[in-house]
Amino acid sequence: MSFVRVNRCGPRVGVRKTPKVKKKKTSVKQEWDNTVTDLTVHRATPEDLVRRHEIHKSKNRALVHWELQEKALKRKWRKQKPETLNLEKRRLSIMKEILSDQYQMQDVLEKSDHLIAAAKELFPRRRTGFPNITVAPDSSQGPIVVNQDPITQSIFNESVIEPQALNDVDGEEEGTVTSQSGESENENELDNSLNSQSNTNTDRFLQQLTEENSELISKLWTDIQQKIVTQSQITPPGTPSSALSSGEQRAALNATNAVNRFQTRLQPEESTETLDSSYVVGHVLNSRKQKQLLNKVKRKPNLHALSKPKKNMLSGSTTSADLPNRTNSNLDVLKHMIHEVEHEMEEYERWTGREVKGLQSSQGLTGFTLSLVSSLCRLVRYLKESEIQLRKEVETRQQLEQVLGDHRELIDALTAEILRLREENAATQARLRQYMVTTDEQLISLTHAIKNCPVINNRQEIQASESGATGTRVMDSPEGPVVNANVSVPLMFREEVAEFPQEQLPVKLSQVPDPPDKMNLAKNFPAHIFEPAVLLTPPRQKSNLKFSPLQDVLRRTVQTRPAPRLLPTVEIIEKEQNWEEKTLPIDTDSQNSSEENRLFTQRWRVSHMGEDLENKTQAPFVNLSQPLCSSHSNTQQSRSPTFSEELPVLGDGQQLRTNESLIQRKDIMTRIADLTLQNSAIKAHMNNIIDPRGEQGDGLRELNKQESASDMTSTFPVAQSLTPGSMEERIAELNRQSMEARGKLLQLIEQQKLVGLNLSPPMSPVQLPLRAWTEGAKRTIEVSIPGAEAPESSKCSTVSPVSEINTRRSSGATSNSCSPLNATSGSGRFTPLNPRAKIEKQNEEGWFALSTHVS
């Protein structure tokens, strides 16, 4: 056996193997079948390629390039001379003041935005729902129940989110940025000085800007612009970046503050070319990554030192292509936004009517900031003005509402007052109608009462005897007209009384039994007493206590109110004068006429004196037992001052112009008063003699008789010796004279009816002596001399022309007066009232004439 190794694998000498040749199979090329599918649709377009290229580019190249340039400038400034170091420090502090504070503020706002976004993610999202629920009719709670916020929100607000955490700057990050920004100790010292200088106040910065650094700032801006121009000439512009996806654009809509912050970090006005704003949006979305890359670059100084040639190449090639265009695009976006704000402000100013300010030319970041701040100030001012105007409108509305409420209250009050006045007016009209009905009934009853009143029926026999005696006198005398003394009641009264009998009267009258031998009261009145009357003054009666005697008698007749008490002064005077008339001699006609004139005036005066003049009127009658001359003198002396006061009234308001007429009128009125008193005394004594059995009357008449009898026995003892023959002659003479006076008075009345047509003013206080009478004018003509006593006052017209004139004047004045007849209850004696007192009473109270109106 052999131990030699034999190489079995080696080639055999002399033996050669031929390799096997494989045959290639020829492949048959098939043609492209377009009918199956077209893959060119899925091929990327040039726009997609550009977009993919921009997506994969680094987003921090511009920021890194700007920081590298800043470091290069710092090294360059550090190598310069020391005297220029201070200038460069100041220049850098100005740049830091402009840019760094704004960067810090934007960083804080960005942090706060992220913190708020993180806080919102802690809570569940809620959506507003609108349930289709029918609410119960009586339920006070709404259909949607509002749930309270969960407890986690309050806990989060108290613990996590603090007010200072939103606006404070993170000190650690700021410290790392400032500590790693330099390459050596000099750079650290420079950064510290810049940080210390950047903390200056804004006011100091503005002051330095305006006073010291204006030239430095202008030089700085010119240097920067020259560098930008040279870089733009060396490198062509880069390709624009494509648009981002829709999701990134939606995310960018909520990052407006971050976009503005990044735009302000770029250098202003580096080029005039435009660039799409998608780069800015992408930078905002990757702001966290940019900061991390920036910190990594600052933390590697060795790497930064080794890459100096690369850095120079970046500044020379690609960076110079991208940076100017992108910064210019950002400035254009900012400028466009500022212009939009200005345009909106202009539209708002035009809409509100304010002064429109033009667009301000903005150069660089300072111009943008100034325009933005000015727009913000204007907007705040406009908001303030609108708020003030709104407050004024609210105050004006409140005032108008208050005024409206006051006006509504006034309208309500006026409406209530009008309704109340309507009710009062209706009630007043009802009372007026009732009063008119009652007044008509009382007038009818009054007419019936005048016809049936037995007041002076006891004068019938005296009138019959007087008519019998005067009938013969009148037939014998040539001057006396034929006038019947017994004038009956006018036809008007008779018709009215006939139409209303006693059973149909609304007011029952007090029936007094008349004696069978007495006649009616109204038949004793002459026709002129019943003449129609017109009210010349409006009714102004203030008191119900002051009535004329005839009104009192008529009121007692219709049972309305008892009559006031009447003093028996006139009857006492008349009965006292009867004995004086017996004692006085009847010698001559002149003496009789003077006495009758005097007595007429005195009697007319005495009947109007009243209670105040009662003592004055009784004083002259005590002296009537003396001779005629003494009585004339005493009466004239006592009456002269009284007549001097009433001369204008007796003369119907006409003032006397001469002293002679004044004296003559005093004498005439004195004589008339004396004659009237004598006539009254004789008439009273004649009644006592003719009717010895006594007259029917009230207690006042009997009292007057007793007083007059006692006065006669004490004062006139000589009167018992007179013969009845002389008395009858005297009575007949007096009756004749009274009939003559009555006839003349009737003639005067007829003349007034026929001739006088001129009417006096209705409100005239002065009574005219002769008043016209027409049937259509309804004038009141009343005679103050009644039918029973008028003949005694007629002697004044038969003796002397002076006395005749006075009698006519007095009769005319009394016939035109509107005062009623003065009557005493039960006695039937009527005396005229004082014209002066009558006119004053008309002026004060007003007076209704009680005579009948002729239609």
Curated annotation (Swiss-Prot):
Q: Where is this region: Disordered?
A: 164-200, 300-328, 789-834
Q: Where in the cell is it found?
A: Cytoplasm, Cytoskeleton, Microtubule organizing center, Centrosome, Centriole; Cytoplasm, Cytoskeleton, Spindle
Modified sites of kind Phosphothreonine = 235
Q: Which InterPro entries does the UniProt record give?
A: SPICE1
For this UniProt record, the keywords arranged alphabetically read as follows:
Cell cycle, Cell division, Coiled coil, Cytoplasm, Cytoskeleton, Mitosis, Phosphoprotein
Determine if Coiled coil is one of this entry's keywords: yes
Ranges of compositional bias, category Polar residues: 314-328, 794-828
In its keyword annotation, does this UniProt entry include Phosphoprotein? yes
Mainly resides where? cytoplasm
User: What do we know about how this protein assembles, alone or with others?
Assistant: Interacts with CEP120.
UniProt-recorded name of the protein: Spindle and centriole-associated protein 1
In its UniProt entry, the species of origin is given as Pongo abelii
Taxonomic placement: Eukaryota, Metazoa, Chordata, Craniata, Vertebrata
